[in-house]
Amino acid sequence: MSVHVQNSRMTTAKLRQMKMNGEKIAMLTSYDFTLASLVDEAGIDILLVGDSASNVVCGNQYTLPITVDEMIFLTKGVVRAAQHALVVCDMPFGSYQISEEDAVRNAIKILKESGCDAVKLEGGEEILPAIRHMIQAGVPVMGHLGLTPQSVNQFGGYGLRAKEEAEAEKLLHDAKLLDEAGCFSIVLEKIPAALAAKVTQAVSCPVIGIGAGNQCDGQVLVLHDMLGLNQGFKPKFLRHFASLASVVKDAVSEYITTVKESSFPNAEESY
C-alpha cells in the first residue's frame, strides 16, 4: 500500500531554506502531463510552465503571442503531474502591464483555474506596484531580471544583458526591490556571472540562473533544449544532457518502415 507523504511537496519556504543551507535548486520548464510526470519523478524542485511554450509548443518566433487562457490550459496538465515539484506559471505578455488591478485579476485567475503554486513576471521597478499588489492578495511571485524575452522588441534581440555598469547597477537595485517586496525567488537570465553572484549574495530569496554562471542558488533550462530536441539551437549557456532528436527521428523512421512493409503489427500484436 502506498502512503502519500504530506510534506513531500516543495514549497516556497523550503526553497528559501535550501538557499540558507547552500543546497542548489534545480528547475526545468514543462508544458505537458507526460514529460512533467517524468521530470517530477526524477526529483526536480521546480517545474516552470514557461511562456516559452509559445516557441517550443506553438512554433512562434517570440513568446509574445501566447495568452493567459493558453497558459492555464498547459499548466493544468503539469499540475496534475507534479507530486513533488513546485509549479510556477509564467504570466504572459499583456497580462500584468496594463494596470495593477488587471495584473492581480489575471494572477488570481491563473492560480485558481490552473492550480499552480505561483506565477512569474518579467521586469523590475517598473512592475513593482503590480508585484506588491499580487503578494498582498496572496499570490506567490517569482521575479525575472536580465534578458526578459517579453521585451525582445524593446531590447532588439536576445543578447547578453547588464554588460555596462549603469545597467548592472539597475539590475542589482531591481533585484533588491523585488526581494524586499516579497518575491520568493528571482530568475536571472543571460547576464555576466560576476554580477549574478553579486545579486545572489545581496538578496535573501533564492536566485535561479540561466546563462548567469554557477554561483546562483539554482539553475533553470528549457526541457526540450537540454534534451537536445530543438535542433540547431545551442547558445553558449546550454548543455545538452541528451540528444533525443535523433532518437525520435530514428524511432519514427523505423515505425514508418514496418508499416510500409506490413511487419507491424505482427501476429503477437494483433487481437
Residue spans of the language-model regions?
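Alpha/beta enzyme core
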Residues: S2-Y271
